[in-house]
């Protein structure tokens, strides 16, 4: 039984006993008859009548018995002189007793008072520590064998697993590395976008190696008061040394490992730097053969302090990116275990339709499809549920088919999405259209889904311009067919501006800054280029978008009849796949 459970049971037993005592005290009759209380004058009358048999005097109280056996008590007044003579004359058997208080009774109030004061002081300290985050939190390791995750549960990352297998082999067989004089890396940094499986990989290493696994977040080190984070780092590594060989995993290490020395940081600056300094010291403090492996994960390796990444600390840095088509298929097969799939469902086709999806996205995709299958009363997951789940992930919400839309607004959405689809289909280098719909979903009135035929790492200038043209196609179609623009292009313009700005300022595809890449900065108020250069970049971004918009408008005006046919078909059917779009535009 846990300590919290034991404490709760004890509390309830004490409450029941206290309730029974109150019940007996107030409602139940006494087990013995209480003596009758007599006044002093009544006692003297009984004494004169010789009805008193015996008397015991204790301090100022007389307890006695009548001749008939009735007990009584009398409180003696201060002027009760001569009482002994009267009792003797009446022939009453009398005794005198002196009440002696034990020493512990005299000391008990003082002890109780001190105990109450100490308890209140301890309670106040605990409350204060909890309020300011100062309570010590001992990190408990995951014992060997408790991690259910192994490399068999990690799919689509064969290269990354190959790098980590050396760490596992060292933890299992350190002697062969020591014999040859090899030094295993002290630290392993996993970096990549969210949802790619960095934490899963760390747990798989612990599960494969069968060693204790300490896991915590980088933000748990940074506290309000200076010194608390450094203290927690010392405590963590002290426990790690006691449990060696083991793995210490720090998730989101950028919360504590950011670059030092920026004056723009306000609040928590000294505490974070002291915590980072202590982490650096601890990683230098254990030897190459102590068996403590530090693993960390981050989405932003570019903001980490250089001292943290030097050889001897995190000297093995492993990128964990989104999987390719083959990796996505492997991940889908792992997450499909335990799910009832339709025999006709092709996971390879699903993998080809989901470029850029991470492992977390694919797991969520299959889970959403399973929920949709249950909602529709089906016993298997079909491609229909997969399509709907992909749309939910891409567009950010379920279809709002019951929403009432004005006919003119529905036509405008159809024109807008048809413009995207036409430009994407007729522009060389653009990603092919997979689906176009005017069914509202999330905050969008409709959307056009385009995906590359193959996974792509590099993009040329013409390919990026083709993407910009596709984004501007909806706005141009509205202006050509309907005569004016609407707010429906808000997200398209935001994305187009971002791509154009990156082309000019990061990829060397402009003239304003030439081949110089403008660095990013996370510090508020810190300028990374002059105002003149920033203005020149903005002017070139505007000129690029204006030129591409003119080309897109010219393309739409040339193919106006095709656009109208696509709008009519889309308005009637509401959803078209890529083959339908290409058939209509080729007619």
Curated annotation (Swiss-Prot):
The name this protein goes by in its record: ATP-dependent zinc metalloprotease FtsH 2
Enzyme class: hydrolase
Gene Ontology MF annotations: ATP binding; ATP hydrolysis activity; ATP-dependent peptidase activity; metalloendopeptidase activity; zinc ion binding
Gene Ontology terms: cellular component: plasma membrane
Function: Acts as a processive, ATP-dependent zinc metallopeptidase for both cytoplasmic and membrane proteins. Plays a role in the quality control of integral membrane proteins.
Gene (name only): ftsH2
Record topological domains on the Extracellular side: 34-102
Cofactor binding, per record: Binds 1 zinc ion per subunit.
Record family assignment: In the central section; belongs to the AAA ATPase family. In the C-terminal section; belongs to the peptidase M41 family.
Residue ranges, Cytoplasmic side: 1-12, 124-587
InterPro entries on file: AAA+_ATPase, AAA_lid_3, ATPase_AAA_core, ATPase_AAA_CS, FtsH, P-loop_NTPase, Pept_M41_FtsH_extracell, Peptidase_M41
Binding locations of ATP: 192-199
Subcellular localization(s) per the UniProt record: Cell membrane
Record's subunit section: Homohexamer.
Keywords for this protein: ATP-binding, Cell membrane, Hydrolase, Membrane, Metal-binding, Metalloprotease, Nucleotide-binding, Protease, Transmembrane, Transmembrane helix, Zinc
GO BP annotation list: protein catabolic process; proteolysis
Membrane topology of the entry: Multi-pass membrane protein
SUPFAM superfamilies: FtsH protease domain-like, P-loop containing nucleoside triphosphate hydrolases
Annotated active site: 417
């Amino acid at each position: 039984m846990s300590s919290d459970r034991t404490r709760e049971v004890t509390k309830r037993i004490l409450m029941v006993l206290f309730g029974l005592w109150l019940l007996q005290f107030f409602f139940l009759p006494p087990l013995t008859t209480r003596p009758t209380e007599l006044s002093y004058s009544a006692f003297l009358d009984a004494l004169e009548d010789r009805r008193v048999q015996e008397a015991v005097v204790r301090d100022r109280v007389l307890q006695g018995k009548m001749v008939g056996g009735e007990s009584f008590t009398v409180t003696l007044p201060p002027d009760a002189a001569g009482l002994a003579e009267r009792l003797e004359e009446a022939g009453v058997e009398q005794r005198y007793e002196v009440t002696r208080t034990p020493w512990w009774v005299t000391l008990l109030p003082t002890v109780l008072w001190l105990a109450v004061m100490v308890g209140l002081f301890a309670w106040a300290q605990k409350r204060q520590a909890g309020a300011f985050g100062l309570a010590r939190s001992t990190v408990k390791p995951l014992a060997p064998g408790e991690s259910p995750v192994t490399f068999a549960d990690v799919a689509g990352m064969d290269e990354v697993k190959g790098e980590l297998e050396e760490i596992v082999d060292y933890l299992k067989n350190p002697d062969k590395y020591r014999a040859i004089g090899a030094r295993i890396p002290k630290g392993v940094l996993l970096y990549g976008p969210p949802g790619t499986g960095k934490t899963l990989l760390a747990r798989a290493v612990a599960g494969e190696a069968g060693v204790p696994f300490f896991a915590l977040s980088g933000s748990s080190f940074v506290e309000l008061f200076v010194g608390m984070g450094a203290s927690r780092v010392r405590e963590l590594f002290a426990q790690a040394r006691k449990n060696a060989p083991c793995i210490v995993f720090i998730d989101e290490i950028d919360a504590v490992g950011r670059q030092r020395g920026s004056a723009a940081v306000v609040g928590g600056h000294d505490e974070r730097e002291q915590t980072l300094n202590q982490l650096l010291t601890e990683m230098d403090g254990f030897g190459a053969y102590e068996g403590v492996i530090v693993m960390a994960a981050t989405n932003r390796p570019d903001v980490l302090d250089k001292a943290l990444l030097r050889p001897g600390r995190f000297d093995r840095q492993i990128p964990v990116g989104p999987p390719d088509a083959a990796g996505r298929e492997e991940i889908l097969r792992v997450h499909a275990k335990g799910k009832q799939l339709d025999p006709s469902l092709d996971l390879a086709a699903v993998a080809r339709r989901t470029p850029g999806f991470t492992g977390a996205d694919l797991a969520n995709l299959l889970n959403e499809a399973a929920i949709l299958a249950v909602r529709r009363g089906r016993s298997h997951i079909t491609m229909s549920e997969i399509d709907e789940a992909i749309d939910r992930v891409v567009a950010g919400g379920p279809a709002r088919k019951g929403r009432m839309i004005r006919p003119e607004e529905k036509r405008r959405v159809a024109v807008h999405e048809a413009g995207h689809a036409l430009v994407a289909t007729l522009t060389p280098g653009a990603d092919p259209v997979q689906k176009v719909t005017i069914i509202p979903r999330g905050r969008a009135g409709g959307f056009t889904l385009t995906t590359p035929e193959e996974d792509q790492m590099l993009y040329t200038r013409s390919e990026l311009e083709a993407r910009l043209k596709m984004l501007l196609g909806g706005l141009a179609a509205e202006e050509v067919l309907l005569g004016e623009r609407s707010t429906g292009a808000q997200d398209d313009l935001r994305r187009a501006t971002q791509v154009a700005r990156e082309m000019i300022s990061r990829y060397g595809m402009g003239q304003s800054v030439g081949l110089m890449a403008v660095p990013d900065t996370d510090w508020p108020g810190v300028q990374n280029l002059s105002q003149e250069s920033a203005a020149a970049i903005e002017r070139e971004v505007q000129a690029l978008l204006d030129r591409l918009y003119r080309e897109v408008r010219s393309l739409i005006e040339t193919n106006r009849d095709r656009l109208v046919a696509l709008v009519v078909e889309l308005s009637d059917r509401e959803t078209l796949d890529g083959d339908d779009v290409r058939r209509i535009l080729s007619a």
